[in-house]
Amino acid sequence: MSLSDIQQAILSLITNNINADGVSPSQTEIARAFGFKGVRAVQHHLDVLEQQGMIRRIPGQARGIRLKHLTEVDEVALALQSKDVLRLPVLGRVAAGQPIGADIGEDHVVLLDRVFFSPAPDYLLRVQGDSMRDEGIFDGDLIGVHRTQDAHSGQIVVARIDDEITVKLLKISKDRIRLLPRNPDFAPIEVRSDQDFAIEGLYCGLLRPNR
């Protein structure tokens, strides 16, 4: 089956967008470009393009259209050119439970869409424990951390107590600082005056790897 003129034009739009920006257009952007009333028509044409071996789609990923003729190396190179793609190192573990010893050493680097985070993170940490369960942060998740020492009461932070790292809800009152879990099975951590305490960064979103 040959491609229609519209399907060839959609393929050209996808190719040009990937070459220029490193990412494919969204289905909404394709619909707008061709005057479709919604994305259903776009999905039909994308189905045909995929059946013809021109593209492949990554389920559940925004802008997840890929050109079949690109190699994995080509895709990574294009992604690194995009302003919407973050290249983030995984810098060890962070406790969502009792603080654990710092485990800071670059494990690997992942490429992620900026849309998953606000503000943009500087690095990722892998969560160990479930003390932040009620905030939707689970054991094994990768959390984005925006590196800063400025934080306000009520924000979720990555904090250092002496040589240990933890992720908790920050509560600051007139005479004390507490790090609160979001799971009733865990007790708050009271920061003592004789401890070396610092905010390492703000929690700004997460990635849940396939279990």
From Swiss-Prot:
Q: Which UniProt keywords apply?
A: Autocatalytic cleavage, DNA damage, DNA repair, DNA replication, DNA-binding, Hydrolase, Repressor, SOS response, Transcription, Transcription regulation
Which sites are catalytic? S131, K168
Disulfide cysteine pairs (residue numbers):
none
Instruction: Output the Pfam families linked to this UniProt entry.
Output: LexA_DNA_bind, Peptidase_S24
Q: What is its EC number?
A: 3.4.21.88
Which residues does UniProt assign to DNA binding? 27-47
Its biological purpose is as follows: Represses a number of genes involved in the response to DNA damage (SOS response), including recA and lexA. In the presence of single-stranded DNA, RecA interacts with LexA causing an autocatalytic cleavage which disrupts the DNA-binding part of LexA, leading to derepression of the SOS regulon and eventually DNA repair.
Q: Kindly state the subunit structure of this protein.
A: Homodimer.
What is the name of the protein in this document? LexA repressor
**Gene it is expressed from:** lexA
